[in-house]
């Protein structure tokens, strides 16, 4: 009986002190870096504002994925048509933006903030003012950052959106 106890203790001791390198090893998990950095997302949004105010539809639409959606319903073709109309009817556009959040995900980024667009209409002394919340979902396609989805709303006020600015 005494020998069994000694053998049992010896076997347990061997298992506990057995060199760790002989045990089964699991490779360490390496997390993939995000496909978009916060700085890249910020630069992209700055480029978006710049191209919007230059009103060149070709340059501007390069920022959108061909599968892009606007306000949960407009397709790429609809988006292009909408912005083309806006650019065609504008003498100039001013775009103010305050980014509140940039969230980085494995597959992209979400950028949220508030915008204010002042649209000087062609052949009119009036300017339209639009403002509200905005959100972009960004992805990387073929190595290029693009808009997957853009959603925005408008703050409605009791006064008219047409303002005679000097």
Predicted regions and their residues:
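Solvent-exposed loop/turn segments at secondary-structure junctions
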Residues: 67-69, 117-119, 153-157
